[in-house]
């Protein structure tokens, strides 16, 4: 009898452990998938941003959201004597809610707000380390992008929404969307992509977006 009881006990314990392990895996995968995607849901628009009506519908099904604009552009250095450098970069323009899921890692460890905010007459910009080497720059140097001059505040180590970044032809740079207004970078004819990352309630019905 005792042998049967002990076997039954360990059998139930094993089944319980497997169930707990399975749920832990599911939970971990869900969190990782959300971080890779950039949110619970990612919506992509080509060559435009969402209209006011579209944004209203998006807000109805989300608890929070962030807008990210991506495009390629040329950057150049300011006067370095007789040397003048240019490079193709992948620009990522973000708002104050970015990142919605996961964490962005930069060096030095500043907040995104501090790294990108306007100081004096220049907004900040975050760049990949490879761009500094390519253009012979350092943190604190200035970088010309469009009609605007940005100050390099930090280097980029990693970003969470890698699943929505697509193929990059050059080093990544991150800047504040507000700084784009007078840069001339999003003029008519510019090829850009807008991503809306959303956080939603569990089992959220998405039929409203489809229509």
Please state what every model-predicted region is.
Residues 1-211:
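Membrane transport/envelope proteins' first extracytoplasmic loop
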